[in-house]
């Protein structure tokens, strides 16, 4: 039996989770065929794997080989992302044949690499304690118009409860700049309550798209993508059904000076909402993560915030983050919450050794490493406040959460401020300045490569010495 490319054109998502014990290849140039399949038990989407082949003809040969050597029936083979090369997702009728199918694919001269469609999850400690919003995910609410902000600015009433801002020197940095809507930051997460009273003014509005006309006006492959995209449910309303993504977005850039609620580290920004995680567990697939990263890369994001992890090493994800690096985009990643050493037990995407990846551990209000936080003197770069962090949640609400998920957005917000003041800074410069300017802490010595916690006030002092006066401000 042979499947043609035409007969394999549709997509079929499978949500069931399992474990396969397939570990992706190690980093660097090693061939995946040299890496043994282990029993580490990473979760994956049942019956699915991703494969990169040399040509469409190679895909046909691979499918034929799957029937003969793995005894598996390939049902659907869609292109994963036409702009990222010949990546395909293969669905097998029998999940028990997945291990054999990947092994046989890796032995084929037509295959560059093959890996399971891993599952990822949020890196917050306690989303379960926050009530789930009643309406989210597929079919989220219509976009509302942003209200006019008060002039002059009015103090945010809950800002006194945000110890993280004072720890990192945010108020001092605001004397230079509070951010700018010109800085586009992609929050890749569970979606965002894009109508939240403290977020609506800082949501990205795709200038090349007309809302609700059913036309892909900007020809980017996504119809009516006004504030971003929902890759989990495949629609234009990336509304948060978990609370996690709204919380991380609020830490990055809740509107400052509107007299409501809280403030982000950056009081102004443009937040691109990219949802690939969802549900009460805040989970999503490798396939959708790659699509979200590529969307951000191709649609103008300058910084990406990533408070999620899980799964084994993925060459597909490594390549996607590399494409972002090629465009100078900073990729901020949460270190993970297992309390383990990322140098010896890598967490992904935090442990990808790429120039644009900046990995963040969590500290508490006493500047101690959080008990749950992953660390690593090589793999983790710096720390930021991540315990009992107050921020936005769906439905115009607020809550305190803990996790490296909460630490990473502090660094993202700091990067927004630097990018506002020094627009020519790319990922390499942003990463270097944020690392070189940390507040040295004894509790972090030997735990993160810099030995310190984020200090945006010092980052501006270093930037001034390196690049001169800022180019923009309040």
PLM segments and residue spans:
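Subtilisin-like serine protease catalytic core
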Residues: 171-285, 302, 325, 354-356, ...
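C-terminal subdomain of the subtilisin-like protease fold in secreted/lumenal serine endopeptidases
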Residues: 263, 292, 297-308, 315-316, ...
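Extracellular S/T/G-rich loop segment that most often corresponds to the catalytic His/Ser-adjacent loop
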Residues: 329, 347-420, 424, 428-432, ...
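Inhibitory N-terminal propeptides of secreted protease zymogens
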Residues: 27-138, 172, 181, 301, ...
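Bacterial N-terminal signal peptides
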Residues: 11-20
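Structural recognition of the beta-strand scaffold that forms the well-ordered cores
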Residues: 50-52, 89, 113-115, 184-187, ...
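Protease zymogen maturation seam
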Residues: 30, 81-82, 107-184, 192-203, ...
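Bacterial N-terminal signal peptides that target proteins for export
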Residues: 1-12
């Amino acid at each position: 039996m042979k499947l043609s490319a035409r007969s394999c054109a549709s997509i079929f998502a499978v949500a069931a989770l399992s474990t396969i014990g397939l570990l992706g290849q190690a980093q660097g140039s090693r061939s995946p065929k040299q890496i043994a399949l282990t029993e580490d038990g990473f979760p994956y989407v049942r019956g699915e794997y991703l494969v990169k082949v040399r040509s469409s003809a190679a895909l046909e040969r691979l499918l034929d080989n799957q029937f003969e050597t793995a005894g598996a029936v390939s049902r659907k083979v869609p292109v994963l992302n036409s702009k990222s090369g010949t990546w395909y997702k293969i669905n097998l009728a029998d999940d028990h044949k997945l291990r054999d199918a990947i092994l046989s694919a890796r032995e084929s001269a037509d295959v560059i690499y093959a890996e399971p469609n891993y599952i990822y999850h949020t890196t917050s400690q306690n989303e379960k304690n926050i009530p789930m919003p009643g309406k989210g995910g597929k079919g989220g609410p219509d976009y509302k118009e942003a209200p006019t902000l008060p002039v002059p600015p009015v103090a945010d009433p809950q800002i006194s409860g945000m110890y993280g801002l004072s720890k990192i020197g945010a108020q001092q940095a605001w004397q230079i700049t509070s951010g700018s809507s010109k800085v586009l930051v992609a929050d890749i997460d569970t979606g965002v309550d894009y109508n939240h009273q403290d977020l609506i003014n800082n949501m990205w509005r795709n200038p090349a798209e007309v809302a609700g006309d059913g036309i892909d006006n900007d020809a980017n492959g996504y119809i009516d993508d006004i504030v971003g995209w929902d890759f989990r449910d495949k629609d234009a309303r990336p509304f948060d059904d978990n609370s996690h993504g709204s919380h991380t977005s609020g830490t990055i850039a809740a509107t400052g000076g509107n007299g409501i609620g809280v403030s982000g580290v950056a009081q102004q920004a443009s937040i691109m909402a990219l949802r690939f995680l969802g549900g009460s567990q805040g989970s999503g697939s490798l396939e959708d993560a790659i699509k979200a990263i590529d969307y951000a890369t191709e649609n103008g994001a300058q910084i990406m915030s990533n408070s999620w992890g899980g799964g084994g090493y993925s060459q597909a994800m490594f390549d996607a983050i590399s494409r972002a690096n090629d465009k100078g985009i900073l990729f901020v990643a949460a270190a993970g919450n297992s309390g383990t050493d990322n140098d010896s037990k890598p967490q992904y995407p935090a442990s990808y050794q790429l120039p644009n990846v900046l990995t963040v551990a969590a500290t508490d209000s006493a500047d101690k490493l959080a008990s749950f936080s992953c660390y690593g003197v090589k793999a983790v770069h710096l720390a930021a406040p991540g315990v009992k962090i107050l921020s936005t949640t769906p439905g115009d609400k607020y809550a305190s959460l803990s996790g490296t998920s909460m630490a990473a957005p502090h660094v993202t917000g700091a990067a927004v401020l630097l990018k506002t003041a020094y627009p020519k800074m790319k990922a390499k410069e942003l990463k270097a300045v944020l690392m070189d300017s940390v507040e040295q802490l004894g509790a972090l010595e030997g735990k993160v490569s810099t030995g310190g916690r984020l200090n945006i006030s010092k980052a501006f002092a270093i930037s001034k010495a390196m690049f001169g006066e800022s180019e923009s401000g309040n």
